[in-house]
């Protein structure tokens, strides 16, 4: 009996010391599952509400005092700075092409690439979208893809914006590194700055005077689109190469008035026949253009 009493007392003292230590140092407590915690596992998971530098509070002069007149001024300016409608950005990768010759002028779409672009144009037409802006990379394969799509959707070719910021390139060194693709550091510096400038030009919440939801179509390239997706969703940009998207596929991102960003489609190409699904430059056919 004496042994049982001693054991019980020792166990109780140990448990008491354990819980006392937990109260003193709550940071050492571990949840049964990390998903039960309301705090991000990684600080980088916290959403930056002013990612586009258009958060209303960042645009309005701060309160100078607590007087009613000053508070009314601040609230009125804050309301005027708020976006009211969403922006939809639909990104389309160019169709299949052949990397033939030393000049971009010779990098035409293959016959299959033209068919891919035609299916994508029909799909965009079926969605019934009224386009506010169409932007295309200035590279040959993106220009040809854009021309084919324009035949299917209601948008005048003369209004298309041709943007060199969207040209293909090396946005940022990928993680994990890959052995088959290692651009020089100078290329990352040159291309990365340009592609980031393209992101900042087209990805931002709506202006306060925008009265309806807007739709922007961007015809570009695989590397650029994947980088844009990571940046827009505030994922580590170095992870862009882990994503794979097919030729002429559709990626749809929405920027809400609050600045939150969501993705509706990522590399959608299910509207094409299986024989048209490709994502790499063909090596076994001749350029038919």
UniProtKB/Swiss-Prot annotation:
Belongs to the phosphoglycerate mutase family. BPG-dependent PGAM subfamily. It is a single-pass membrane protein. The chain crosses the membrane at residues 7-23. Keywords: Hydrolase, Membrane, Mitochondrion, Mitochondrion outer membrane, Transmembrane, Transmembrane helix. Displays phosphatase activity for serine/threonine residues, and dephosphorylates and activates Pk92B kinase. Has apparently no phosphoglycerate mutase activity. It is an enzyme of class 3 (hydrolase). It catalyses: O-phospho-L-seryl-[protein] + H2O = L-seryl-[protein] + phosphate; O-phospho-L-threonyl-[protein] + H2O = L-threonyl-[protein] + phosphate. Interacts with Pk92B/ASK1. It is found in: Mitochondrion outer membrane. One of its GO terms (cellular component) is mitochondrial outer membrane. The keyword Membrane applies. This is Serine/threonine-protein phosphatase Pgam5, mitochondrial. It comes from Drosophila sechellia. Its main location: mitochondrion. GO terms for molecular function: kinase binding; phosphoprotein phosphatase activity; protein serine/threonine kinase activator activity; protein serine/threonine phosphatase activity. It comes from the Eukaryota. InterPro entries: His_Pase_superF_clade-1, His_PPase_superfam, Mito_Ser/Thr_phosphatase. Pfam families: His_Phos_1. Gene3D superfamilies: Phosphoglycerate mutase-like. The gene is Pgam5.
């Amino acid at each position: 009996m004496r042994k049982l009493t001693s054991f019980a007392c020792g166990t109780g003292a140990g448990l008491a010391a354990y819980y006392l230590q937990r109260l003193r140092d709550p940071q050492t407590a571990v949840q049964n599952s990390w998903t039960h915690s309301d705090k991000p596992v990684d600080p980088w998971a916290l959403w930056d509400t002013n990612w586009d530098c258009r958060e209303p509070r960042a645009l309005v002069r701060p309160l100078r005092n607590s007087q009613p007149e000053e508070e009314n001024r601040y609230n009125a300016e804050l309301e005027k700075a708020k976006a009211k409608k969403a922006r939809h950005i639909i990104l389309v990768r160019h169709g299949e092409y052949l990397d033939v010759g030393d000049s971009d002028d010779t990098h035409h779409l293959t016959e299959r690439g033209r068919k891919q672009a035609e299916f994508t144009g029909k799909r965009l037409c079926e969605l019934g979208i009224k386009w506010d802006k169409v932007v295309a990379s200035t590279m040959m394969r993106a220009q040809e893809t854009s021309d084919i799509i324009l035949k299917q959707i209601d948008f005048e070719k003369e209004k298309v914006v041709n943007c060199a910021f969207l040209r293909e390139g090396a946005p940022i060194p990928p993680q994990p590194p890959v052995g088959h693709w290692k651009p020089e550091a100078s290329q990352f510096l040159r291309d990365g700055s340009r592609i980031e400038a393209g992101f900042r030009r087209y990805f931002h919440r709506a202006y306060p005077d925008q009265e309806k939801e807007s739709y922007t179509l961007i015809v570009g390239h695989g590397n650029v689109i994947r980088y844009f997706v990571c940046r827009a969703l505030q994922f580590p940009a170095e992870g862009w190469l882990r994503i794979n998207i097919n030729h002429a596929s559709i990626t749809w991102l929405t920027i809400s008035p609050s600045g939150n960003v969501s993705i509706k489609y990522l590399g959608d190409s299910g509207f094409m026949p299986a024989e048209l699904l490709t994502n790499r430059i063909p090596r076994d056919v001749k350029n038919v253009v």
